[in-house]
Amino acid sequence: VPFTLKREFSGYHDTELHDCSSSASAIRKVLMNIPASPYLPKNISAQLSEQLPPGSLSIIQNEWNFSCPVEADDFSLLLKYRLLSEPHESLCKYQDVSEELSNRIIRNRNQFRSFGQFCTLLKTKELTYSRISRSLLHILLSITTEDMHAYQDNSCSYARILGFRKEHTDVLRAMKDHASIPIITKLGKSASLLSPEASRMLNQTSFASDLYESVISDKFGIPFTSEQQKQIIRV
């Protein structure tokens, strides 16, 4: 039976680093407060080496100022466009958007300054920051309650392979031959393998990836690569 382990030294939303086991919120705060730099500063690397597995820290160091850091406010203009284009009566169709939250969004959207600022503005005792942030992401990505019900009813409709080791090609081949669900390795060939609901889920996932890619492309000045263009990773 699954059970939770209480974190020692720091709380879930603690924003200060501790000697070890700091919260994700604290680690994000450190990363987001770093002044513009082409590389991750050595003192920050030293701090994070006590908080993160070596592999995770290595990824941050290698991707710094190339594809990270990315924060919610980087999606502010995209979200503002979506909120301005949505009529009041349509907001409630999105996952987690209640009538109360819809009303607050419409009443306050002219005060929108950034993703984070708007979450704080909308927050009440009944509507937490996390709930609002999640709801706004659903609006941004056009994820409706109807979508979620369809995905839940169809459970696991496919498996998309993102990468594999070259010496285990036989495992991938066996999966394709014997799996009870479609195994997707190329997006362009997925349409004929999937049900309408599974295709919709995969298309939404690809759209979210492309949206994220467009943000890092604009922020860091790197070429945009769509999800359709990305190749499976072989190591």
Predicted regions and their residues:
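Active-site cores that bind ATP or allylic diphosphates and position pyrophosphate for catalysis
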Residues: 1-235
